[in-house]
């Protein structure tokens, strides 16, 4: 029988367990699905809650301590207690303040835990063993502290899976300071005392972001911070906004549901962040004696290729459908661009790829994220630009850039098709129109129509209903354009975007969306004729050594 007592939170009083000679292990859930959890929980429970229940049920864990740092932990306790399979299930009440009364409250909770453990084990608490574990834990935390340049991971539980994935995407170590990461108690006294231990546990360094107080030690070697949140979690978003307002460090916010994530969107966010802080795993070297450079943007809908000469002038360009495979689509686009320029593959000094297929096309000398490439391409096309709005087939991005085209910050909408080119493409098919026809008709509207749902499937149902009511196609298209513009303007405002605005990507060809977006932002949105080539242009420019 497994006598291990499992736990999750870094506020777990592990030293108390050591005083009872009880082995402990921190759970690090990363289920592939929530099959067990969804059979006994509400669907809106956060991903971490479901992941933890899934882990407990599938591993048949019978001993568990939870800390009631949030409602989800309380609900996990309720579910597991109701099932009646646990031999030991303890919910520790954790104060959110560090006043004297808070320490007293936690001390009483620790004494209650000792009573429960006495009943479970039949053994008395050994304060010397607990004190030894306390001191050992401090030494362990010191060994875990990274003193070389690194990236901090903070916020909600990310686990080994997320930490390793981030480390694979950038050549820097990651310091895990999430709520289940590095545990740094205050120094131990010479003799055990419940009050001193309660105070040390409550006032540990890198305090939980849910606390109403902050105990932070300086981290001068951190070059950037990744703030991780869980879907449906209400806590960490507020802390992230507070940190952003301070503007003291380079921040990236990511969100997962605790299942294994290898999506292109998450990789794009992390890779772009690495490039922003100068830690890209695939740093592009400047080509010498340049004659011709090719940039290839392998997107979800189209693959764009551009060839620049030594003067950074566009020699040829091509836009082709990506088709069934990113690699074959990129090969065709590059071949077409070479043919148009009257060049051969060996005439190119370098090929740089970007887009979601950038790492799989297999024809490049280097690759970079579309965040960096669109920033460089936008600066090339419109040097006055300070905010880049890129709406592609699969996602939409807003990028703030400086006077040199360097990325200052960015946000992405990549969770669904809403507000993207795919959304408009599906609506065009529903209306039996081509995208150019849709662009023209959208400017001829007469009556205001509101598309209330931003979900692609539900919006399609609304469009079908409007068609059934004989609503003019022009008015329906205007409603769709306003819907896309509204979602995009929200991203711009969230990022703090400012004029001058430039729009790139395929949706920039839709005049109705551009007009609605300009109206909502209160400033003209510039659309260059090479808008859809912006990413490929930026990729090629990177080979010139532009940073």
Write out the residue ranges for each language-model feature.
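Glycine-rich phosphate-binding/hydrolytic loop that grips phosphoryl groups
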Residues: 268, 421-425, 528-547
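Adenine-nucleotide phosphate-binding core of ATP-dependent small-molecule kinases
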Residues: 459-492, 532
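Glycine-rich phosphate-binding loops at beta-strand->alpha-helix junctions
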Residues: 356-357, 493, 497-520, 531-532
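Glycine-rich phosphate-binding loop plus the immediately following alpha-helix
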Residues: 322-326, 408-443, 447, 541
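Short glycine-rich, Thr/Ser-proximal phosphate-binding strand/loop in the N-terminal lobe
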Residues: 296-328, 332, 336, 407-415
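An N-terminal assembly and electron-transfer interface module characteristic of large anaerobic redox
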Residues: 1-293, 311-313, 323, 416-423
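Gly/Thr-rich phosphate-binding beta-strand-loop-beta motif of the actin/hexokinase/Hsp70
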Residues: 287-311, 386-405
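Conserved phosphate-binding/catalytic loops in two-lobed NTP-binding clefts
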Residues: 248-257, 370-371, 518-537
């Amino acid at each position: 029988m497994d006598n291990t007592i499992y736990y999750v939170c870094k506020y777990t009083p592990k030293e108390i367990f050591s005083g009872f000679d009880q082995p402990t292990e921190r759970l690090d859930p990363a289920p592939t699905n929530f099959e067990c959890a969804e059979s006994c929980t509400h669907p809106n429970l956060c991903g971490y809650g479901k992941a933890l229940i899934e882990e407990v049920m599938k591993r048949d864990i019978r001993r568990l301590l939870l800390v009631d740092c949030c409602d989800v932990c309380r609900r996990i306790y309720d579910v597991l207690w109701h099932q009646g399979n646990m031999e030991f299930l303890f919910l520790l009440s954790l104060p959110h303040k560090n006043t004297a009364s808070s320490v007293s409250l936690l001390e009483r909770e620790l004494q209650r835990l000792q009573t429960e453990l006495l009943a479970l084990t039949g053994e008395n608490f050994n304060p010397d063993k607990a004190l030894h574990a306390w001191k050992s834990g401090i030494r362990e935390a010191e060994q875990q502290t990274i003193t070389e340049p690194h990236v901090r991971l903070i916020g909600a539980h990310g686990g080994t899976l997320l930490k390793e994935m981030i480390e694979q995407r950038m050549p820097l170590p990651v310091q895990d300071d999430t709520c289940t990461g590095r545990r740094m108690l205050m120094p131990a006294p010479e003799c055990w005392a419940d009050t001193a231990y309660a105070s040390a546990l409550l006032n540990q360094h890198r305090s939980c972001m849910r606390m109403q107080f902050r105990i932070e030690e300086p981290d001068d070697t951190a070059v950037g911070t990744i703030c991780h949140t869980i879907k449906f979690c209400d806590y960490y978003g507020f802390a992230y906004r507070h940190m952003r307002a301070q503007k003291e460090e380079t921040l990236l916010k990511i969100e997962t549901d605790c299942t294994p994530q290898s999506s292109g969107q998450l990789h794009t966010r992390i890779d772009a962040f690495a490039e922003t802080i100068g830690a890209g795993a695939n740093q592009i070297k400047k080509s010498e004696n340049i004659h011709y450079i090719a940039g290839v943007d392998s997107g979800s809908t189209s693959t764009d290729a551009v060839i620049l000469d030594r003067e950074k002038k566009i020699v040829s360009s091509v836009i082709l459908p990506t088709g069934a495979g990113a690699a074959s689509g990129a090969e065709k686009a590059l071949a077409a661009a070479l043919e148009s320029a009257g060049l051969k593959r060996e005439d190119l000094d370098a090929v740089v790829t970007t887009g979601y297929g950038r790492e799989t096309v297999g024809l490049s000398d280097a690759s970079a994220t579309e965040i960096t490439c669109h920033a460089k391409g936008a600066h090339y096309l419109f040097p006055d630009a300070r905010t880049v709005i890129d709406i592609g087939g699969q996602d939409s991005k807003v990028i703030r850039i400086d006077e040199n085209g360097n990325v200052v910050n960015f946000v992405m909408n990549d969770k669904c098709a809403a507000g993207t080119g795919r959304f408009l493409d599906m609506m065009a098919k529903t209306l039996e129109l081509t995208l150019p026809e849709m662009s023209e008709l959208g400017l001829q509207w007469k009556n205001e129509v509101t598309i209330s749902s931003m979900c692609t499937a539900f919006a399609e149902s609304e469009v079908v209903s409007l068609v059934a009511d004989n609503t003019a196609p022009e008015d329906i298209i205007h409603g769709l354009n306003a819907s896309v513009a509204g979602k995009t303007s929200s991203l711009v405002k969230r990022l703090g975007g400012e004029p001058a605005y430039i729009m790139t990507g395929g949706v920039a060809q839709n005049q109705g969306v551009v007009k609605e977006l300009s109206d909502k932002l209160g400033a003209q949105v510039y659309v260059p004729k090479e808008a859809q080539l912006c990413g490929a242009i930026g990729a090629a420019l990177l080979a010139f050594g532009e940073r």
